[in-house]
Regions:
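N-terminal secretory signal peptides that target proteins for export/translocation
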Residues: 1-4
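Intrinsically disordered, low-complexity segments enriched in glycine/proline and serine/threonine
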Residues: 6-8, 29
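Bacterial N-terminal signal peptides
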Residues: 9-20
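Sec/Tat signal peptide C-region and signal peptidase I cleavage site
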Residues: 21-29
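Long, low-hydrophobicity ectodomains and other hydrophilic envelope-associated domains
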Residues: 30-196
C-alpha cells in the first residue's frame, strides 16, 4: 500500500514538473520575435532567392552597444569580434540550415511607428579561406539592416561578409567584401520582445 502511494506521489510530482517546464518553455517562445522573408542575392551570373529568418530573443541594450563601441575604439575589428562573441541576441538563418548566432540586434525607432533593426553576427570563415589566405578572411562579420513598418512588414539588406571600422570616434563604417549586398524582401514579423 505504501508503495502505491509513493508511486502515485512520484507521478503527481512528475506531472507538476512537466507542466511547469512546458509553460516556461511556451512563455519563452512567446517572448521571441520571428522575422521571415526572402533573401535575393545578386552576384555572379545569376540571381538566387532563398528563405531568410531572424529569431530575436532580446535586443542589445544601450550598455552593450557602448561596450561594442568601446571595443571597436580600443582594438578595432578584432576587439569587436571578441566583444561580440560573448553576446547572443538571436539567430540568423539563410536557407534551410541551422543558421548562426545573431550576436547583436540593435533596435531603433524608424519612420512613423516603425523599427529599424541592425544585426551583427560572426560569420563562419571557411577552411579554404584560411588555408589559402584569401582576402575574405578579413571580413569576419555579417551585417543586416532591416526596416519594419508599424505592421511588422518591411525589407532590408544583408552583407554576408563585412569589415567594421570606426570613423570620427563614434560612427561605424561597414565595408562589404566587394559584392552587392543581398536584398531582404517580403519581411514579416510576428511575436513581441518584452521591453525592459
Amino acid at each position: 500500500m505504501a508503495k502505491r502511494k509513493l508511486i502515485a506521489l512520484l507521478c503527481a510530482v512528475c506531472c507538476a514538473v512537466t507542466t511547469t517546464v512546458f509553460y516556461a518553455a511556451e512563455s519563452k517562445a512567446q517572448s521571441r520575435q520571428y522575422i521571415n522573408g526572402t533573401i535575393v542575392s545578386i552576384g555572379g551570373r545569376s540571381t538566387r532567392a532563398r528563405q531568410f529568418s531572424l529569431i530575436v530573443n532580446s535586443y542589445t541594450t544601450p550598455g552593450q552597444v557602448r561596450e561594442l563601441n568601446d571595443a571597436l575604439q580600443r582594438g578595432g575589428q578584432d576587439e569587436l569580434l571578441r566583444a561580440l562573441s560573448g553576446m547572443d541576441a538571436g539567430r540568423v538563418r539563410i536557407g534551410s540550415g541551422v543558421g548562426v548566432t545573431a550576436n547583436a540586434i540593435i533596435a531603433e525607432p524608424w519612420g512613423e511607428g516603425g523599427t529599424k533593426l541592425t544585426v551583427f553576427y560572426q560569420r563562419d570563415v571557411r577552411f579554404f579561406e584560411l588555408r589559402y589566405g584569401t582576402r575574405s578572411q578579413d571580413y569576419r562579420i555579417g551585417y543586416a539592416e532591416i526596416f519594419l513598418d508599424r505592421n511588422g512588414r518591411g525589407e532590408g539588406t544583408l552583407i554576408p561578409a563585412a569589415r567594421v571600422r570606426l570613423r570620427d570616434g563614434n560612427t561605424w563604417e561597414v565595408e562589404d567584401f566587394g559584392v552587392y549586398p543581398a536584398r531582404l524582401m517580403g519581411l514579416r514579423a510576428s511575436g513581441r520582445i518584452p521591453v525592459g
